[in-house]
Every structure is written in C-alpha cells, then in structure tokens.
Amino acid sequence: MNTSITARELFDQQRDKLALRWVAGQKGEHREIQAGSNNARRPSLAGYLNVIYPNKVQILGTEELAWLDSLDARQRWETIEKIIQVQPLALAISKNQSCPEDLRAAADESNTPLWISPKRGHELLNHLSYHLARTLAPRVTLHGVFMEIYSIGVLITGEAGSGKSELALELLSRGHRLVADDAPEFTQIAPDVLDGTCPELLQDLLEVRGLGVLNVRDMFGDTAVKKNKYLRLIVHLTRPMTEPTPSGYERLTGDSGSRHVLDLDVPLITLPVMPGRNLAVLTEAATRLHILRTKGIDPAAMFIARHSNLLERRTP
C-alpha cells in the first residue's frame, strides 16, 4: 500500500501538539513525501539543518540561526538558496525565535512551507521524526479478525464461511478483546514489529452471519475493544476435507509454520474446522502454546527427546 503525506497534512496533524504557526510559503501546502522516497544519503526524514545531506523537514534551532547570522551576506544568501533548492517538505523554527526576513522572503518566493513553534529543537525533532516514520512505514491490509488473546495480538484467518466471526464472538464472551474485524491494517513500525489497527469505518464493529453488524463496545463494554496491538501469531482456520491427513510428526508438533507479512515471518498455526470442535478453546490453547514456545518450552520436542532416551536405554 502506497502512503504519503503532504505539508498541509503534517501541519494539521501536529499543529495542536507542537503549537505550530505557518508564517510563510503557504502555497507549498501540497508538497509531499512518499513512502520509500528516502535514500541512504539522507540522514533522516526530519532533522536539524543540514545543507549537505538535507532532511525533508529542516529544523532551525538557536545554533542553526546563530550560524546563519555569522555568515557574510554572500555566503548567507548562497546557503539559503541551497536550503530552498532541494525543495524540503517544510522548514521549522524552534523556541518561537524570530524568522529572518530573507529566509521568510525566500520561503514565500519558492513556496516552501515555513513554520514556527514554541517547542525546543529536540522536541520538534522527536515528534516530527516519529510521526513521519510511522505515517510512511510499510503497511498492508489483511483479511481476518485481529484480536488480543492473553495479551498478544492474534490474527484469525480462513476462507469465507469458516467461522472466523463466530469464533471471535465466542472469544469476546471469554474476556478477550477485539482490535479489528474483516480488514485490519498492519504497519511495520520497526524491523521486527507489525502494529495492527482498525480502519476508522470499522471501529468497534464485528459482522456475524445471521446477526449482522454488532457493536462490540456497546455489547461487551469498553474493555472489550483495543485500539492497536502488535501481531505475534496467525491462527488459520481450514476445512480438513480439502487437506491431506496429517502425518505422525504433525500429530506431535501440530500444523504450524509461518506467513510472510511485509518483511516479517509471522508464526502460523492451522486449526481444522470440524463439527464438535471447540475452536475458542483450541485458539486459546494455540496462543498459550505460542507463548511457551517463545520462552523456549516445546512439549513436542520434550516428548520426542523422552522417547529417544527410552529407546536408547532399551537398546541392547
């Protein structure tokens, strides 16, 4: 999924938090950063003024403005031209410092957004860097029901009619929490972290065949819904009639594997859907088993080791 952010969107999203004022270059509100547009030669999306390897959002603190003031007229104008020529998304001045008139004029002439904030430079840097990195991070929408089960994020997947929503409803009645139904969005916010959220349109809603759309918050209370959760496990529901009979080894270890999501391999456990099986209990057990495995505890491996030791002792 391609993502981008314009200068206007960034300003509106951070205006209240950073008390931003737009003082010049208002016509540049449509300047845009696209996901994946950064390259190895650029230090970061947002950073202190860097003329050699410019950031997309250039922050001018006390030292940066003092450095500009220390230049002679020719050097100062050449430096301002370099800042403007690379077309940054925006320039941001910290601590409500006065904006130099030549910088303001250059920003207006080139339609370069110029903002002023009462926040200190490092506060601007931290907020803008985090917000841009999260907004432009790789993201994908997966079909399924995303829930918090025993404090970890579990995505329930399967074919249409496999019982995902009914399973989610049963898990909700057992005290677990819903993050998103049908189309959870996952963002890779770190090399090994996928953060799952719910689209605004589907917030708090769960669709169950025969019942229609249910408002989980109204039915089960505020504690039954969760704003976001890191994806740690996928439970896939499958119809065994179309699958081969599990081998003896699979009967010991279960049908487990992984699914590639963005740049990560997420652990996956497959549960056959058959009459009489309590899928809610099985899903809870699968989640507990995953938690044990992350701690290095594997019951199947323990059994195989015991069996091997027993055979060795009985071998003459």
From Swiss-Prot:
Broadest EC class assigned to this enzyme: transferase
Q: What's the domain remark here?
A: The Walker A ATP-binding motif also binds Pi and PPi.
Give the UniProt entry's GO cellular component terms: cytosol
Q: How does it assemble?
A: Homohexamer.
Identify the stretch(es) annotated as Important for the catalytic mechanism of both phosphorylation and dephosphorylation. 206-215
Role, per record: Catalyzes the ATP- as well as the pyrophosphate-dependent phosphorylation of a specific serine residue in HPr, a phosphocarrier protein of the phosphoenolpyruvate-dependent sugar phosphotransferase system (PTS). HprK/P also catalyzes the pyrophosphate-producing, inorganic phosphate-dependent dephosphorylation (phosphorolysis) of seryl-phosphorylated HPr (P-Ser-HPr).
Positions that bind Mg(2+): S165, E207
Xref: NCBIfam families: hpr-ser
Q: Which PANTHER family does UniProt cross-reference here?
A: HPR KINASE_PHOSPHORYLASE, PROTEIN YJDM-RELATED
Which Gene Ontology terms describe the biological processes this protein takes part in? Answer: regulation of carbohydrate metabolic process
Beyond the main fields, what else does the record say?
A: Both phosphorylation and phosphorolysis are carried out by the same active site and suggest a common mechanism for both reactions.
This protein's cofactor list reads: Mg(2+)
Q: Gene of origin?
A: hprK
What positions does the entry give for ATP binding? G158, E159, A160, G161, S162, G163, K164, S165
Name this polypeptide is given: HPr kinase/phosphorylase
- Record's catalysed reaction(s): [HPr protein]-L-serine + ATP = [HPr protein]-O-phospho-L-serine + ADP + H(+); [HPr protein]-O-phospho-L-serine + phosphate + H(+) = [HPr protein]-L-serine + diphosphate
Ranges for region Important for the catalytic mechanism of dephosphorylation: 272-277
- Cysteine disulfide partners in this protein: none
One Pfam family cited in the UniProt record for this chain: Hpr_kinase_N
Q: Which UniProt keywords apply?
A: ATP-binding, Kinase, Magnesium, Metal-binding, Multifunctional enzyme, Nucleotide-binding, Serine/threonine-protein kinase, Transferase
- Record-listed E.C. numbers: 2.7.11.-, 2.7.4.-
Give the family per the record. Answer: Belongs to the HPrK/P family.
The family database entries (HAMAP family) matched by this protein are listed as:
HPr_kinase (MF_01249)
The source's domain of life comes to Bacteria
One GO molecular function term of this record is:
ATP binding
